Curated annotation (Swiss-Prot):
<dbReference type="Pfam" id="PF00491">
    <property type="entry name" value="Arginase"/>
</dbReference>
<comment type="pathway">
    <text>Nitrogen metabolism; urea cycle; L-ornithine and urea from L-arginine: step 1/1.</text>
</comment>
<dbReference type="GO" id="GO:0005739">
    <property type="term" value="C:mitochondrion"/>
</dbReference>
<dbReference type="InterPro" id="IPR023696">
    <property type="entry name" value="Ureohydrolase_dom_sf"/>
</dbReference>
<feature type="binding site">
    <location>
        <begin position="185"/>
        <end position="189"/>
    </location>
    <ligand>
        <name>substrate</name>
    </ligand>
</feature>
<keyword id="KW-0056">Arginine metabolism</keyword>
<feature type="binding site">
    <location>
        <begin position="193"/>
        <end position="195"/>
    </location>
    <ligand>
        <name>substrate</name>
    </ligand>
</feature>
<feature type="binding site">
    <location>
        <position position="187"/>
    </location>
    <ligand>
        <name>Mn(2+) 1</name>
    </ligand>
</feature>
<feature type="binding site">
    <location>
        <position position="183"/>
    </location>
    <ligand>
        <name>Mn(2+) 1</name>
    </ligand>
</feature>
<feature type="binding site">
    <location>
        <position position="185"/>
    </location>
    <ligand>
        <name>Mn(2+) 2</name>
    </ligand>
</feature>
<feature type="binding site">
    <location>
        <position position="268"/>
    </location>
    <ligand>
        <name>Mn(2+) 2</name>
    </ligand>
</feature>
<dbReference type="InterPro" id="IPR006035">
    <property type="entry name" value="Ureohydrolase"/>
</dbReference>
<comment type="similarity">
    <text>Belongs to the arginase family.</text>
</comment>
<dbReference type="GO" id="GO:0046872">
    <property type="term" value="F:metal ion binding"/>
</dbReference>
<keyword id="KW-0464">Manganese</keyword>
<feature type="binding site">
    <location>
        <position position="183"/>
    </location>
    <ligand>
        <name>Mn(2+) 2</name>
    </ligand>
</feature>
<dbReference type="GO" id="GO:0000050">
    <property type="term" value="P:urea cycle"/>
</dbReference>
Length: 340
């Protein structure tokens, strides 16, 4: 209920503004001030963190957390909007140590830093619609990337955020990337339920925009005829779970990013079997084990320039927060791939 209320609150604000006969110009100016303030906060935090890292020295790339708590483009439940703070809490909860499996220390700011969240709901409360909102997300990512050596690791949010994030990464780096996409679904509908920004359409937007050269989708087990047709249209390499045992060796020795601007990794938590991660909006049995995912990530060769972890839904998690810990572990191991 909370997610539905959050998703519709902005409509009532705009209606009240319209009833009060607020001019379109005045509304636009107000929206611009809110957006500028949001970007300024992220920019100043990124500058401060980057200055610290440069002063410390010895770092080429540091993973930088950026939360995008957006859930209204989900076709089912909007709980992923509440995920970023829960993931952060799980990262630092103290139930495990602060090292990644490869031995990188998360307490070292040269490995991981954080610039906070894009205030999605506050911006939407001002009547900002999705075309402009996606631009705000893209500009937020570019703001992080402007500060060397920060590289964005984005916390969703539903999977619609991957489109503006990948777009920003590609535009900022000056060319396409290769994408490793782990998911139960291909998210490549042209416009799911008429919404071009649906979480089920994000990779259609990415591919038609030319922001990726190769798109590898791993863990797929809920795919329609349109999903397969769209995959063929865009030359997507789709690896379905029904053939995973045959594909395992290849997927655990991937080499990506040569000849392009690097590798982007997008992890939808529902790529995992729900036995490992029940706190997702779209539960789809028959998925990857957590160790399957880690083997793919750990063995991947390529320069990982950015990534995201999406579709964790805290409202469907277990009482003890098992899926939050899973999402946090994914963030930790992606941090190890990005930082250097």
């Amino acid at each position: 209920m909370g997610g539905v209320a959050a998703g519709t609150r902005w409509i009532h604000h705009v209606r009240r503004l319209s009833a009060a006969k607020v001019s379109a110009d005045a509304l636009e100016r107000g929206q611009s001030r809110v957006i500028d303030a949001s970007l300024t906060l992220i920019r100043e935090r990124a500058k401060l963190k980057a200055e610290l890292l440069r002063a410390l020295g010895g770092v080429k790339a540091s993973a930088c957390l950026l939360g995008v708590p957006l859930g209204h483009n989900s076709s089912f439940l909007q709980g992923p909007a509440f995920a970023p703070p829960r993931i952060r809490e799980a990262i630092w909860c103290g139930s495990t140590n602060s090292s990644t499996e490869e031995g990188k220390e998360l307490n070292d700011p040269r490995v991981l830093t954080d610039v906070g969240d894009v205030p999605i709901q506050e911006i939407r409360d001002c009547g900002v619609e999705d075309d402009r909102l996606m631009n705000v997300v893209s500009e937020s990512v570019k703001t992080v990337m402007e500060e060397d050596p920060l590289r964005p690791l984005v916390l969703g949010g539903d999977h619609s955020i991957s489109y503006p994030v990948v777009r920003a990464v590609s535009e900022k780096l000056g060319g396409p990337v290769d994408i490793l996409h782990l998911d139960a679904h291909p998210d490549i509908y042209d416009a799911f339920e008429g919404n071009i920004y649906s979480h089920a359409s994000s990779f259609a937007r990415i591919m038609e925009g030319g922001y990726a050269r190769r798109l590898l989708q791993v863990g797929i087990r809920s795919i329609t005829k349109e999903g397969r047709e769209q995959g063929k249209r865009f030359g997507v390499e789709q690896y379905e779970m029904r053939t995973f045992s045959k594909d395992r060796e290849k997927l655990e020795s991937l080499k990506l990013g040569e000849g392009v601007k690097g590798v982007y990794i997008s992890v939808d938590v529902d790529c995992l079997d729900p036995a490992f991660a029940p706190g997702v909006s779209h539960i789809e049995p028959g998925g990857l084990s957590f160790r399957d995912v880690l083997n793919i990530l750990h063995n991947l060769q390529g320069d990982v320039v950015a990534g995201d972890v999406v579709e964790f839904n805290p409202q469907r998690d277990t009482v003890d927060g098992m899926t939050a810990m899973v999402a946090a572990k994914l963030v930790r191991e992606l941090t190890a791939k990005i930082s250097k």
